[in-house]
């Protein structure tokens, strides 16, 4: 699946024109995740559809969702900007930035320096880089370019091998372990439990995908995660604020 998405993305990049630059106060993803009021940091995701689950919500208001996520205690908002597979939009980033004071992570398949430029133009604070999408050396170049433009990166791995290749080149400040197998689409927090041991202590660790219960959160926290990235579980709920309260119930997580 990742190959199919990346092929579409390469096609889009060949047509990409930079939008007008949007200016917003910068917010640090890493700092915000470190000073959470919840038992661990929460990157709450705005995602209308996905390749694995199809359409999650017929219509969405990214600004209304972002406001509720902020009220619920999220540390950052992840905004899907890919249109083809996730029904996202690059315009959502600025809309969310105008609405909340949290850092905004642009979630897309970033493969080229031009997309890094675009990410800075649309007003994001941070962007995703996927280790499985390119060589570690190329990822490092995009990472350095992003930081030179004031953007932080969430660097995502799906396996021990990917993390090993990455660490041979550099140690990202924020590392995500994605619990979703991109071939089968199955998710399991045991991915985080397995790979977290290899994450250097100086990196901030985010467990991503397939987090649906307080027990999932308790397990990844115990494995060493500093934060979680949650999409579907929140997007499917009408009362997203209550959904955050239910997921992060202290007693369930700390038992
Ligand atoms: O969500 C998918 O189906 C998907 C398929 C292929 C590549 C990426 C995909 N998702 C991107 C994500 O990383 C998730 O949206 C994010 O981690 C949240 O996951 P979830 O809480 O399971 O919605």
Swiss-Prot record:
Record PROSITE patterns? IGPS
What does the sequence similarity comment in the record state about its family?
Answer: Belongs to the TrpC family.
Query: Which pathway is this protein engaged in?
Result: Amino-acid biosynthesis; L-tryptophan biosynthesis; L-tryptophan from chorismate: step 4/5
A GO term, aspect molecular function: indole-3-glycerol-phosphate synthase activity
Describe the reaction catalysed, as an equation: 1-(2-carboxyphenylamino)-1-deoxy-D-ribulose 5-phosphate + H(+) = (1S,2R)-1-C-(indol-3-yl)glycerol 3-phosphate + CO2 + H2O
Pfam short name (any one): IGPS
Q: InterPro entries per the record?
A: Aldolase_TIM (IPR013785), Indole-3-glycerol_P_synth (IPR045186), Indole-3-glycerol_P_synth_dom (IPR013798), Indole-3-GlycerolPSynthase_CS (IPR001468), RibuloseP-bd_barrel (IPR011060)
User: Which PANTHER family does the record associate with it?
Assistant: INDOLE-3-GLYCEROL-PHOSPHATE SYNTHASE (PTHR22854:SF2), TRYPTOPHAN BIOSYNTHESIS PROTEIN (PTHR22854)
Q: What is its EC number?
A: 4.1.1.48
GO annotation terms (biological process): L-tryptophan biosynthetic process
Task: Establish whether keyword NAD is in the entry.
Answer: no
Which UniProt keyword terms apply here? Amino-acid biosynthesis, Aromatic amino acid biosynthesis, Decarboxylase, Lyase, Tryptophan biosynthesis
Q: Which NCBIfam families match?
A: PRK00278.2-2, PRK00278.2-4
- Its name, as the record gives it, is Indole-3-glycerol phosphate synthase
């Amino acid at each position: 699946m990742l190959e199919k998405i990346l092929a579409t993305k390469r096609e889009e990049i060949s047509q990409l024109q930079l939008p007008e630059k949007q200016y917003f106060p910068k917010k640090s993803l890493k700092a915000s995740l470190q000073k959470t009021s919840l038992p661990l940091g929460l990157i709450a995701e705005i995602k209308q559809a996905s390749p694995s689950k199809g359409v999650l919500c017929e219509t969405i208001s990214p600004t209304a969702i972002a406001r509720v996520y902020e009220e619920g205690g999220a540390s950052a908002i992840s905004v899907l900007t890919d249109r083809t597979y996730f029904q996202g939009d690059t315009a959502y980033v600025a809309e969310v930035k105008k609405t909340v004071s949290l850092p905004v992570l642009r979630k897309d398949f970033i493969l080229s320096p031009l997309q890094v430029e675009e990410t800075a133009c649309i007003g994001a604070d941070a962007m995703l880089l996927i280790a499985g999408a390119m060589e570690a050396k190329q990822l490092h170049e995009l990472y350095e370019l992003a930081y030179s433009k004031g953007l932080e990166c969430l660097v995502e791995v799906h396996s021990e091998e990917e993390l090993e290749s990455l660490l041979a080149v550099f140690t990202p400040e924020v590392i995500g372990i994605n619990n979703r197998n991109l071939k089968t689409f199955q998710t399991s927090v045991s991915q985080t439990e397995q790979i977290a041991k290899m994450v250097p202590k100086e990196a901030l660790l985010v467990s991503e995908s397939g987090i649906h219960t307080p027990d999932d959160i308790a397990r990844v926290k115990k494995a060493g995660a500093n934060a979680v990235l949650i999409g579907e579980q929140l997007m499917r709920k009408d009362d997203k604020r209550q959904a955050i309260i239910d997921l992060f119930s202290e007693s369930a997580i700390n038992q």
